[in-house]
Amino acid sequence: MSAELFLEIGTEEIPAGFLPTAMADLERLIRKELETGRIGFETVRTFATPRRLVLAVTGVASGQARQEVTASGPSVSVAFDADGNPTKAALGFARSNGVEVSDLERRETDKGEYLFVSKVVEGRPTGELLPEMLPRIIAAIPFKKSMRWKDLDIRFARPMHWIVALFDGQVVPFSYGNLTSGNLSYGHRFMAPDAFEVSSLEQYLVEAEKHFVIVDPVKRRQIISDQLAEVVGRCGGKLNPDDDLLDEVAFLVEYPAAVMGGFEDSYLQLPPELLITVMREHQRYFTVVDDSGKLLPRFITISNTRAEDLTVVQQGNERVLRARLSDAMFFWNEDRKVKLESRLDALKNVVYQAKLGTSYEKVMRFKTLAVELAQQQVPEVVELTERAASLAKCDLETGMVFEFTELQGVMGREYALLDGEDPRVARAIFEHYLPVQAGGELPGDDVGAFVSIADKIDSICGCFGVGLIPTGTADPFALRRSAIGILNIILDRGYRLSLPALVERSLGLLADKLTRPATEVAADVLEFLRLRFFNMLTAQGLPNDVVDAVLSAAFEDPVDALQRVKGLASFREEGEFEALAVTFKRVVNIVKGGVDTSVDSALFEADCEAGLFDALQNVTGRFEQFVAEGAYLDALRTVGGLRSPVDALFEGVMVMSPDEAVKTNRLALLTAVARLFQGIADFSKIAA
């Protein structure tokens, strides 16, 4: 027999960002409990609104599956006397397991012959287990932040008000905090707050909707999407697409109603990003554009209540937005009274980080780095890069960014343009913050790219230098994102640069701030970057062992490293690869980091030695040419031609000859071979 398990946790409004993860955790926890408890089930579904988390499991078995267990007992020598009669040890073991001595088995083990007993343990009914299981699940749901309330010794994202727990339509009785489980749920807080009985998921979903609660977030999202399309169509505009906001709003309401509002045309003189930030980030409004993508003085808000006349909702939201935009207009006018560059000195009074100094000091450091990068890579943009770096953080001292911190970079760009700065400088002020998230937009210009790399490497080296290193759970300075950003920018722009040199230069500029030895910091930073690069490449589907092999060989130049990874990954698909990898591994193992590659042909004792030497000389020039061109697949194919002569050497002579001079010469020959392919990858890391 199987039945449905239903659980609803009713709460105060839980933050929208908590709910998708909570749904996933709820499913994970019930699966783990049922599987660990040997209780069969079919499907698990979870739902959430701001005021409830819901779980439904179908096909739940009525009891635990039977389990055959084996218990070990005393050794045979202890269990039986010299005449073969059971001792107290054997009798006690049999009695404790509810069997006769004759039911005990003798088995040979590493320690000798021992007694064992196998028996079938009947499972407990599911109905008995659930009152223990469900409170454990509720307590185990992890939230980024949780709270306590009243004088209760429990924590949850928000205070809990009711619990519905049913198995096969019957209440699963348990207490949690000051609540007792039952079969009563509650409707929408304002539109239908009364209780209603629950008997099953199907009945619950229907009854909840009658009480103005759309429990399924997927359904709510679709309803909102449909309403947005309908409402925006009335004003002749187009919805500014925003799937992330749609996902969030779906968890902000239980019964959505889209409402169109507007604001004065005069506010359209403000930068579009500013208007969108105020509406989207602060009010969770959807923005409206015309056919050309230009913002219209309209917005759409999603209300949590429906009414015949939503004018009051519209007017209330317009009033709130008008106040926000009025503040923005004030800051816009005030900030423009002075030039952006005049704010640079004010950064001397802004602490970037207590041990790393002021924001002004940081700007001076990364300006030096950015200019040097420009000199190395694109000399013609040196002056633009220096100017952009100087202005990059000046908007932090504006009233607008103080009020709307999300607009850092955006306002710097806008104010720079108004001040008559070169458009590439203005663009770089914005772009040096890119990318703002994994897979996000990258700087589209060298000027912004240089400032971005310099700013980010200064942050990483500085934080590592004073012991502010990310942990598994904390990365307050977003150093992982910065590292990934640096690597992506380098790859996107194709810059050929040395990461060790960049890190060393950055640490040199930070010298008086460091609280750790610079050599240790450099090693930690480079390993941090290497791990980020490894994760980036494997996430793209490149084989783990190939990426590891390449990055273990050399990671100085990310562009070169990526070319080597792609070359080796392609070479791996060719028929000779496995045999070649085995041969190369053997070479690496026998030379063990040897450095002497001076070979004396006069010491050769067999044709196979001369054969390998000649083959090595024949391929070296072509190999080095392919490497210089970044044609690593061709380089690997070329060095692959050495497999046969290397194998012949291993078969024809004993490398570790008793003659020390001959042995050294053979090792030097193999070291010269290893030197070629080890510059591409460490083949000992390849799974072959």
Swiss-Prot record:
GO terms for biological process: glycyl-tRNA aminoacylation. GO terms for cellular component: cytosol. InterPro entries: Gly-tRNA-synth_bsu, Gly-tRNA-synth_heterodimer. Its EC number is 6.1.1.14. Its main location: cytoplasm. It is found in: Cytoplasm. Keywords: Aminoacyl-tRNA synthetase, ATP-binding, Cytoplasm, Ligase, Nucleotide-binding, Protein biosynthesis. It holds the Pfam family tRNA_synt_2f. SUPFAM superfamilies: HD-domain/PDEase-like. One of its GO terms (molecular function) is ATP binding. It is an enzyme of class 6 (ligase). It catalyses: tRNA(Gly) + glycine + ATP = glycyl-tRNA(Gly) + AMP + diphosphate. Tetramer of two alpha and two beta subunits. Belongs to the class-II aminoacyl-tRNA synthetase family. This is Glycine--tRNA ligase beta subunit.
